[in-house]
Amino acid sequence: MGDGWLPPDCGPHNRSGGGGATAAPTGSRQVSAELLSQQWEAGMSLLMALVVLLIVAGNVLVIAAIGRTQRLQTLTNLFITSLACADLVMGLLVVPFGATLVVRGTWLWGSFLCECWTSLDVLCVTASIETLCVIAIDRYLAITSPFRYQSLMTRARAKVIICTVWAISALVSFLPIMMHWWRDEDPQALKCYQDPGCCDFVTNRAYAIASSIISFYIPLLIMIFVYLRVYREAKEQIRKIDRCEGRFYGSQEQPQPPPLPQHQPILGNGRASKRKTSRVMAMREHKALKTLGIIMGVFTLCWLPFFLVNIVNVFNRDLVPDWLFVFFNWLGYANSAFNPIIYCRSPDFRKAFKRLLCFPRKADRRLHAGGQPAPLPGGFISTLGSPEHSPGGTWSDCNGGTRGGSESSLEERHSKTSRSESKMEREKNILATTRFYCTFLGNGDKAVFCTVLRIVKLFEDATCTCPHTHKLKMKWRFKQHQA
């Protein structure tokens, strides 16, 4: 979707003015122009190389993390993988050639490769944007119908959806471009088509409007509608839980036999717990809004300007300067670098990234010495971050983990004890909230429990089938620690 952009003519023009002003020598003007042109090329090359590096590194990391971490191989992450593949192809085969076209100001590889490059550009852009739309619909179904989602969205259906997205993208890109359905009859456009050094994507009105609607405007409208519904559903479910929670803590204030001292901190004072949980609900609502705002804000900021000028350009080619069109096009390319950051913000992804970047074998040995389960043959623990593990010895950073046996120092033991106590304090709050969900919500309202989990972890699957089991496991862990 890119146009060529010639470097600016930096040399001064010859002028003859009154008053006997003399022009600078021609040789000095040429040297100055060449020097400025070289500086411009060096600066643009460095900037575009940075964009390519960010796109490739980020998406390779996402694909490797999902492929090598069993915990991340979920249905939603199938769509994330498809998105990362589209962005990776963009970073490897589209953006570098576009950077060469911008820096050199001419196409170096002939007309046929120009059409192939343009087709690949449109293919990756369309696949990336439509996959973002599919992810939005997937999260909408998971949040609004959590139990129905389990049977509605299977792995086979997810693969069919991904293949459909790529097929639609190919129909919008390769078919019309290679068949020359996109070409215009404008004399300036015809001159570009006949020049092997020109690779400007000058299209007719029908193709520009149709491709923009299919590739961007329809997905944009769907994403706006879906994410508005997701946020409204989030607020409604949080209010519903808050109302039920009031009844729950009201019942806790009735006279009860005094508990044993060591069991007293589990639920604490009813009113204080209610205020604390209300604050937690407000924080979750804020986090959901923040996540949705980041998703829609970055996507719209990156692609809306380009697709607006893409429509305007076919009606009046002189209205939008070439440099502005190219800038908006590269702003859209930058979205491929932002996607891994936005859609892989979960703790599971961050842990997988750390394992990939920080010598995983060494990290596995430290985890094993710290009391974690033995790693699988692939070198990764299948239940990374699972609540069933013992409280101590969690892997938190690249240099984390503790050394067992007689080599452990007193300071390390104290540090491990502090981490365990801090984790147990968090589990007390989780236990109280989970007990409330499982005991005081009826069968129909258990979906609320799953909904809140999916709202807070918007792009992770949450276990929704047996919250009672989760409660019992955490309760058993607490009693084991107290013993």
From Swiss-Prot:
It is a multi-pass membrane protein. It comes from the Eukaryota. Disulfide bonds join 114-199, 192-198. GO terms for biological process: adenylate cyclase-activating adrenergic receptor signaling pathway; norepinephrine-epinephrine-mediated vasodilation involved in regulation of systemic arterial blood pressure; positive regulation of heart contraction; positive regulation of MAPK cascade; regulation of circadian sleep/wake cycle, sleep. It is found in: Cell membrane; Early endosome. The keyword Ion transport does not apply. The keyword Glycoprotein applies. Residues 1-38, 104-115, 180-205, 316-320 are extracellular. A lipid is attached at residue 358 (S-palmitoyl cysteine). Pfam families: 7tm_1. Cyanopindolol binds at residues 121, 211, 329. Residues 1-26, 250-270, 387-425 are annotated as: Disordered. The chain crosses the membrane at residues 39-67, 77-103, 116-137, 156-179, 206-231, 286-315, 321-343. Keywords: Cell membrane, Disulfide bond, Endosome, G-protein coupled receptor, Glycoprotein, Lipoprotein, Membrane, Palmitate, Phosphoprotein, Receptor, Transducer, Transmembrane, Transmembrane helix. Residues 410-425 have a biased composition (Basic and acidic residues). Homologous desensitization of the receptor is mediated by its phosphorylation by beta-adrenergic receptor kinase. GO terms for molecular function: beta1-adrenergic receptor activity; identical protein binding. One of its GO terms (cellular component) is early endosome. Residues 68-76, 138-155, 232-285, 344-483 are cytoplasmic. Glycans are attached at residue 14. CDD domains: 7tmA_Beta1_AR. Belongs to the G-protein coupled receptor 1 family. Adrenergic receptor subfamily. ADRB1 sub-subfamily. Beta-adrenergic receptors mediate the catecholamine-induced activation of adenylate cyclase through the action of G proteins. This receptor binds epinephrine and norepinephrine with approximately equal affinity. In dorsal pons neurons, involved in the regulation of sleep/wake behaviors. This is Beta-1 adrenergic receptor. The gene is ADRB1.
